[in-house]
């Protein structure tokens, strides 16, 4: 299993950026090292320019990832939805999103660059999708897929607000639901791979650099290990031939690559077991973000 983290350096979710960002980064990296798990973090360069000036304290968070032996990828500068952007505007945001990750990865000696679309929206028209695919390839990027997602950004908002309100009982309930959904999503991915490829494949998990993931990661990795997983780099996971299957999906949504590959292969997947965020969590999220 490859572990991927979006929206680096940190997803504040309404709380003060520091000291939560430092605490979360440290906790994530400690857990990853403890489990000997490589990971890649996808960076929003715009977070480093908060307030109209370069934030060295935020740069330092990325340096922690590099010092821990992790990889960094491009997640654009401003995390804008490709569905709402022109091809040219999105290309500009990709270019603006690459200076820091290119510098840090070059210093690390890495020649492979990865890109993940914000919200994994890869193009709602064939023209836009094909144009950005070609643009990324020309700039030396590989598009980062994911086969497991757990909507951790939704759980995180509710979790952070519960902690801020001192409601430890609610926070515990949210965290338990989050872990349960992640394991259920993993089981669905394990069932889906053989339906497409007649065998198991390396899974790729999409997470975010946020509080709930940091505080749940140790539990999650232990559960993955008990299911027989070992942790590999994204590059190693993508060496499996399944990942060479083209993504031909044109959509406003950003589903996992299993649904995209199914479209390419002409296979109708059974959605049974594909989990949804519990209704009570979604309602709390809507209240918090409305």
Mark where each language-model region is.
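Active-site beta->alpha N-cap acidic-glycine motif
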Residues: 1-120, 205
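Short amphipathic alpha-helical segments and helix-helix/interface helices
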Residues: 26-29, 59-63, 130-136, 218-221
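C-terminal domain-boundary segment and adjacent tail
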Residues: 36, 145, 199, 209-290
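Residue-level recognition of beta-strand->loop/alpha-helix junctions
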Residues: 43, 76, 147, 235-236
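Short, basic, helix/turn surface patches
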Residues: 66-74, 100-105, 167-185, 256-277
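Alpha-helical scaffold elements lining the catalytic groove of polysaccharide deacetylases
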Residues: 80-106, 125-139, 147-199, 213-216
């Amino acid at each position: 299993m490859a572990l991927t983290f979006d929206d680096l350096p940190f997803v504040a979710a309404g709380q003060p950026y520091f000291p939560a960002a430092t605490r979360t980064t440290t906790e994530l990296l400690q857990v990853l090292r403890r489990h000997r798990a490589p990971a890649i973090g996808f960076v929003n360069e715009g977070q480093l320019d908060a307030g109209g000036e370069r934030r060295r304290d935020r740069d330092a968070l990325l340096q922690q990832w590099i010092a821990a032996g992790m990889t960094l990828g491009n997640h654009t500068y401003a995390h804008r939805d490709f569905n709402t952007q022109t091809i040219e505007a999105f290309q500009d945001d990709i270019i603006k999103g690459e200076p820091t990750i290119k510098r840090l990865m070059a210093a690390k000696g890495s020649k492979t660059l990865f890109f993940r679309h914000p919200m994994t929206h890869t193009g709602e028209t064939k023209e836009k999708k094909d144009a950005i695919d070609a643009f990324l390839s020309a700039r030396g990027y590989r598009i980062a897929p994911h086969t497991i997602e757990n909507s951790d950004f939704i759980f995180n908002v509710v979790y952070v607000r519960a902690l801020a309100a001192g409601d430890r009982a609610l926070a515990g309930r949210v965290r338990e639901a989050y872990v349960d959904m992640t394991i259920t999503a993993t089981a669905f991915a394990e069932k889906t791979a053989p339906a497409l490829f007649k065998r198991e494949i390396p899974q790729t998990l999409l997470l975010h650099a946020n509080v709930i993931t940091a505080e749940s990661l140790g539990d999650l990795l232990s559960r993955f290990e008990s299911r027989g997983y070992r942790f590999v780099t994204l590059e190693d996971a993508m060496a499996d031939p399944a990942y060479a299957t083209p993504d031909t999906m044109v959509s406003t949504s950003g589903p996992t690559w299993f649904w995209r590959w199914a479209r390419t292969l002409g296979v109708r997947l059974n959605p049974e077991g594909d989990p949804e965020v519990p209704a009570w969590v979604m309602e709390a999220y809507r209240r918090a973000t409305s």
